[in-house]
Amino acid sequence: MSTSLVSKPSASKAVVVFSGGQDSTTCLIQALTQYDEVHGITFDYGQRHREEIEVAKSLAKRLKITSHKVMDVTLLNELAISALTRDAIPVSHELMENGLPNTFVPGRNILFLTLAGIYAYQLGAEAIITGVCETDFSGYPDCRNDFVKAMESALVQGMDKQLKIITPLMWLNKAQTWALADKYQQLDLVRHHTLTCYNGVIGDGCGDCPACHLRKRGLDDYLQDKTTVMASLDASEPNA
């Protein structure tokens, strides 16, 4: 009888930047089917809709992910003035003089992906997953594919480690994002238990802020023609 040891394949691991909103929750649900270990990281930056932190904690437990870390990055609140970091600044539907919405938080995704990269290095994870999207994005420059690729390159070079930033929603519209949740039989969970609203209202939200408008329009488009939207999602499967 052989006494040689058979090495066990190392577990595949991913870190999901997890806010508790529709997009990141959908990415988390998908990741649970693709990786042995899924670790969520949520950032407390003193955000206007900070109820999302408790939502993220609740969903992490409900979905039974491997671990969930909430990281204090409230320094960002001091540096970045935005409607999402200042309660006194109302969320506007109009763009600012620089062409960006007043909900844009300068440097937010730069900081989040940097810290997620450090955490992935610590865990030995090969992937960071984030729910940013260029197709239906809200005008944020740090949601663009070019930005994500630049961040990935910086992390790989700066830590001398192979690490991928995966963006499952990058080329999906909101209707297709709803379809992706439905594909994993989690449409109701994402619809009723996530928080996307800038005013901190769970589920369907306040119905007035830009995030709620985008979310509702996508849901309506999906529910009106599920078959067509699901087919378009399947056709884009390499990106989903």
UniProtKB/Swiss-Prot annotation:
Classification via Gene3D superfamilies: HUPs
GO function terms (MF aspect): ATP binding; ligase activity, forming carbon-nitrogen bonds; zinc ion binding
Entry's cofactor comment: Binds 1 zinc ion per subunit.
Catalysed reactions, semicolon-separated: 7-carboxy-7-deazaguanine + NH4(+) + ATP = 7-cyano-7-deazaguanine + ADP + phosphate + H2O + H(+)
Pfam families in alphabetical order: QueC
Enzyme class of the recorded protein, top EC level: ligase
Function field: Catalyzes the ATP-dependent conversion of 7-carboxy-7-deazaguanine (CDG) to 7-cyano-7-deazaguanine (preQ(0)).
Protein name: 7-cyano-7-deazaguanine synthase
Source organism of this protein record: Shewanella baltica (strain OS185)
